[in-house]
A protein has these predicted regions:
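Central hydrophobic cores of alpha-helical transmembrane segments in multi-pass inner-membrane proteins
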Residues: 1, 32-44, 62-63, 86-95, ...
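Single conserved hydrophobic/aromatic residue that forms the stacking wall/gate
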Residues: 2-9, 13, 248-249
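Membrane-interface helix-boundary motifs at transmembrane edges
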Residues: 45-53, 102-108, 185
Length: 250
C-alpha cells in the first residue's frame, strides 16, 4: 500500500539530518579561524582597492566554509563545506592575485588550484558514497551520520580502498609531495589575505579531516598505511630541503 511504501521510505531516510557539533579539537580550529579571519581583513584593508565588497564577500565565504568543516559531524555536510570553501579562494587568486612571471599568471594559478582540489574532492566523494552504501547494505538505513557510519563493518580490501579515497583528498590539500605542485603558484599569486587563509586555515582542514574522519572510520587500514605515509613525509622533508638549497629567490 501507499502507506507501507511511505513508511519504508521513512525508515530508510530516517537518519538524514544536519548535525553540527564542537569538541576540544573543533574549538581550537574555530578559534584559529576567527583570529586569522580578523588578520586577513586587516592586512587587506589598504591592499584591496577594486571590488572591495565582493572581495570581503569571498573572504567571509571562505571563513564560513572552513568553520563548517570544523563543525560538521555528518559526511554530507563535511563534504559540502569542504567544496564550498574552494570556490571563493579561486576568485581571490584569479581576481585580486599578484601579477606573476611569464607563464605563471594568477588565472593559471587559480585554475590549477581549483582543478587539483576539485579532482581530489571527487575522489573523496566516491569514498563517502561507497561507505554510505556499504552501511545501507548492512542496515537498510541510508545515512551520512558520523556516529552511525563508525559502526559499519568493512572487509579489509574495502576499508583500505575507502581510506585511500579520503587520504588522497587530504594529501592534495596538505599538500603531500608529489601532489603539491598547485601550492607554490597559488601562494605566489594570491593576495596577502588569500595567502593567510590558504596557509593558516585551508591547509589545516586536511589535517583535521584526517584526524576526525579517516583515522576513526578506517582504523585498521590507517594503521596498515601509516608506514607509507611516514615515508612520504620523510621524502617531502628531504625534497624540500634539497630544493631550497638550489633557490636564491626567498
Amino acid at each position: 500500500s501507499t502507506q507501507g511504501v511511505s513508511s519504508a521510505a521513512s525508515d530508510v531516510y530516517k537518519r538524514q539530518s544536519i548535525h553540527l557539533a564542537m569538541d576540544g579539537l573543533s574549538v581550537l580550529m574555530v578559534t584559529l579561524t576567527g583570529l586569522l579571519g580578523v588578520l586577513s581583513v586587516l592586512c587587506s584593508w589598504n591592499e584591496i582597492q577594486k571590488r572591495v565588497g565582493f572581495f570581503h564577500l569571498n573572504l567571509m565565504w571562505i571563513l564560513g566554509g572552513v568553520v563548517g568543516v570544523f563543525l560538521a559531524i555528518d559526511l554530507f555536510l563535511f563534504f559540502f563545506f569542504w567544496e564550498m570553501m574552494l570556490v571563493p579562494m579561486y576568485f581571490l587568486i584569479a581576481l585580486w592575485g599578484h601579477s606573476g612571471s611569464p607563464g605563471k599568471s594568477r588565472i593559471n594559478a587559480a585554475t590549477k588550484f581549483f582543478i587539483f582540489t576539485q579532482a581530489s574532492g571527487l575522489v573523496m566523494l566516491v569514498a563517502i558514497l561507497g561507505l554510505v552504501f556499504v552501511h545501507f547494505n548492512q542496515t537498510g538505513v541510508f545515512t551520512f551520520n558520523y556516529a552511525d557510519l563508525l559502526k559499519t563493518q568493512l572487509s579489509e580490501g574495502t576499508e583500505y580502498l575507502l581510506m585511500l579515497g579520503f587520504f588522497i583528498a587530504f594529501a592534495v590539500k596538505f599538500p603531500v609531495v608529489p601532489l603539491h605542485s598547485w601550492l607554490p603558484d597559488a601562494h605566489a599569486q594570491a593576495p596577502t589575505a588569500g595567502s593567510v587563509d590558504l596557509a593558516g586555515i585551508l591547509l589545516k582542514t586536511a589535517a583535521y579531516g584526517l584526524l576526525r574522519f579517516a583515522l576513526p572510520l578506517f582504523p585498521n587500514a590507517s594503521a596498515e598505511f601509516a608506514p607509507i605515509a611516514m615515508y612520504l613525509g620523510v621524502f617531502a622533508i628531504i625534497y624540500g630541503a634539497l630544493l631550497s638549497l638550489s633557490l636564491i629567490h626567498i
